[in-house]
């Protein structure tokens, strides 16, 4: 429940700071705030946040609380440090808003872990694969490529993959992550080196994944899923930092890349559901009273907290294997069309990032190094140059950050900064962020108009479910360029290069 009856009562707790694009949620907006909230938005994006508050009060919004209230609610959780942080693509979600970063002190025995701070699609993330092809090489094969990718990569709700495994293989996969993909021949060794955490969560233990979750995952390896997940053929449209782009193998405009956005499918969803049910029942044992039951949590070091961390790690490994399997299928498709090997086509993974995850990391807090459990829900890690966890290839430019746009709009590659380490626990945005609910999109937008707009932009589209055409239209989302520019201007990430889609594959 919102504490305040009028939107004006909420707005008085939100103040603009002297720092560009930074607003503060002061203590008092909701009872029991341990820290303040920080919101990174420019003036245009701030209007969308304000509108969400007003629409909720008029009962014209989703059943979720407005993002601003959710950011404040997260600040009440035990063990949170520094601030509850919202990034420019923030919007309401389950418990935590999407676009929220929150870190908890590992040395505080009361500090918590919350599945709502990770999300249901554990390790939903983005992978970018480069090629040595240019638009002129594919423009006459664009439709053929789109259809072949659609044929190769299983899409849609409940889709089943070509990468079949038995129960024993699944347990190995959940424990090993991309090491399993390399062993089975679905990944190159170089792929895992340019992947967050080398594509393997060391927390993972498949023993803590329920039988039901495993049953949901065993047939879904190498599947895209539905909703906002996609595989896109893109071309480099603009290069902002030539030195950094060159380190990623990008040197000229019109170079062809493939972007894959997917996660842990039904397996991750079931793990999140199982943990939320268990934690909601057990919170009273630890004398935890949350302001919103969707924030169900337990102490990090409790048996329940550790069980979730191990199961979540297994889901992370599944997601990395999932994106790796689709990389394998995309390489096959391109090889078939161009009659060259994927290696000859230089189909190397530039990077693979997660934007729904919780991880133990070291950060400076008040001049001291602390071990923190950083929850990133709809936000991306943004580590700077020379950070030990940044791959060797990118030590001089910082971690690549992959920002997916919307169907028919730009995507971006950014790099991490020191300011992100100082202000946002090494985090930045993850995408555009929804502006309209799926229901509103279906009611407000025309199927034929959206298809016509894509055709005008010469974008080939393949989609399993026609309703997704409206639900995933650019009008359903915030302006991704505004989101990216806000982060760039705030110094929490730097623009490197921009891509535009020429073919879109969706569930």
Curated annotation (Swiss-Prot):
GO terms for cellular component: nucleus; tRNA-splicing ligase complex. GO terms for molecular function: GTP binding; metal ion binding; RNA ligase (ATP) activity; RNA ligase (GTP) activity. It is an enzyme of class 6 (ligase). Mn(2+) 2 binds at residues 124, 261, 355. This is RNA-splicing ligase RtcB homolog. The active site is at residue 430. Pfam families: RtcB. It comes from Plasmodium berghei (strain Anka). HAMAP family: RtcB_euk (MF_03144). The keyword tRNA processing applies.
């Amino acid at each position: 429940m919102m504490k305040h009856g009028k939107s004006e009562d909420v707005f008085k707790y939100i103040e603009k700071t002297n720092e560009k694009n930074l607003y503060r949620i002061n203590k008092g907006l909701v009872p029991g705030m341990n820290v303040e909230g920080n919101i990174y938005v420019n003036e245009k994006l701030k209007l969308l946040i304000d509108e969400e508050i007003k629409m909720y009060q008029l009962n014209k919004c989703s059943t979720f609380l407005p993002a601003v209230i959710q950011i404040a609610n997260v600040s009440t959780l035990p063990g949170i440090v520094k601030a509850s942080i919202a990034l420019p693509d923030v919007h309401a979600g389950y418990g935590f808003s999407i676009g929220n970063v929150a870190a908890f002190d590992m040395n505080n025995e009361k500090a918590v872990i919350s599945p709502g701070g990770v999300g249901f699609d554990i390790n939903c993330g983005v992978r970018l694969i480069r090629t040595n092809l240019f638009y002129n090489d594919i423009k006459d094969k664009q439709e053929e490529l789109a259809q072949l990718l659609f044929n190769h990569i299983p899409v849609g709700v409940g889709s089943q993959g070509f990468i079949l495994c038995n129960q024993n293989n699944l347990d190995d996969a959940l424990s090993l992550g991309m090491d399993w993909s390399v062993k089975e021949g679905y990944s190159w060794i170089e792929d895992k080196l340019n992947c967050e955490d080398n594509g393997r969560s060391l927390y993972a233990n498949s023993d803590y994944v329920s039988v039901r979750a495993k049953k949901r995952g065993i047939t879904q390896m190498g599947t895209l899923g539905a909703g906002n997940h996609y595989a896109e053929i893109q071309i480099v449209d603009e290069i902002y930092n030539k030195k950094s782009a060159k380190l990623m193998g990008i040197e000229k405009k019109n170079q062809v890349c493939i972007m894959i956005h997917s996660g842990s499918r039904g397996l991750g969803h079931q793990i999140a559901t199982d943990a939320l049910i268990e934690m909601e029942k057990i919170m009273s044992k630890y004398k935890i009273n949350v302001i919103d039951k969707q924030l169900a949590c337990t102490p990090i070091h409790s048996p329940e907290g550790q069980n979730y961390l191990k199961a979540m790690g297994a889901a992370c490994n599944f997601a990395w294997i999932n994106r790796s399997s689709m990389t394998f299928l995309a390489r096959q498709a391109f090889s078939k069309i161009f009659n060259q090997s994927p290696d000859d086509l230089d189909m190397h993974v530039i990077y693979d990032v997660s934007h729904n995850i919780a991880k133990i990391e070291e950060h400076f807090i008040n001049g001291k190094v602390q071990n923190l459990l950083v929850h990133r829900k709809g936000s991306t890690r943004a580590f700077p140059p020379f950070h030990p966890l940044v791959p060797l290839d990118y030590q001089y430019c910082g971690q690549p950050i992959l920002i997916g746009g919307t169907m028919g709009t730009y995507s971006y590659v950014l790099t991490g900064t020191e300011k992100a380490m100082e202000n946002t626990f090494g985090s930045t945005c993850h995408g555009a962020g929804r502006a309209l609910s799926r229901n509103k999109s279906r009611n407000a937008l025309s199927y034929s108009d959206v298809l016509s707009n894509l055709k005008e932009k010469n974008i080939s589209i393949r989609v399993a479910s026609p309703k997704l055409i409206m639900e995933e239209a650019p009008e359903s989302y915030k302006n991704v360029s505004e989101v990216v520019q806000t982060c760039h201007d705030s110094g929490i990430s730097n623009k490197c290069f921009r891509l535009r889609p020429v073919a879109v594959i969706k569930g």
